[in-house]
From Swiss-Prot:
Name this polypeptide is given: Protein phosphatase CheZ
A GO cellular component entry from the record: bacterial-type flagellum
Pfam families in alphabetical order: CheZ (PF04344)
Complexes and interactors: Homodimer.
EC number: 3.1.3.-
UniProt xrefs under SUPFAM superfamilies: Chemotaxis phosphatase CheZ (SSF75708)
Principal location: cytoplasm
Organism encoding this protein: Shewanella loihica (strain ATCC BAA-1088 / PV-4)
Amino acid sequence: MQAETSGLINLAQAKQLVDLLEAGQQEMADELIRDIASPIQKELFDEVGRLTRQLHSAIVDFQVDGRLVELANSEIPDAKERLNYVIDMTEQAANKTMDAVEESLPLADALTMNVQAVKPSWDRLMRRDIQLHEFKALCHDVQQFIERSESDSNRLKELLNNILLAQDFQDLTGQMIRRVIELVREVESNLVSMLTVFGEQPATDKPRASEKCVEAEGPIMNADQRDDVVTGQDEVDDLLSSLGF
């Protein structure tokens, strides 16, 4: 069983309209039609006024939103500078790290070769299978090895410390990247708000091609010399207020 719906006209009104038309009471029939349509017209008028007020308020808020101007004039250019700075800092850190590693590798290789050069004679010494002149030469080699190792190990320590210090850019650049992300989110939010105000309606809301279209008048010429048009947001606001919206 279908639920009853409230129609635009009831049976009694329809019969009354037919009776008036059959009796030739055209004016009374027209008056009855106007009475029937009056609530519908008022509801439509109220809805159009409400939507107009919402759109007007949104446009005014959009125009006076100083945050959008600030975003365009300062925040976005500043964000580009921040990202460029992050790129520069990352590149500098990468170069410092690679330079330190390139210098460290030969030092590590030299330590390995020095150990390999001394190890055979040292092994013979541990086996007590070494001549006196070989022992003297081993002592000189060990002395040179200790001196070179001390110098190379100190340099390796400096280079490793440089690599560690080169990574301190991450804290600063991380903060900058997070700030840029916040800015992008804020811009996205403003764009969504803008699309809400000025965006297109869904396709289902568009009028069908078969329906009668209203011809656009185009821009109003000499608007400041006419009394039947409004020329600014203040006048729009006054008009809506006078209509109760």
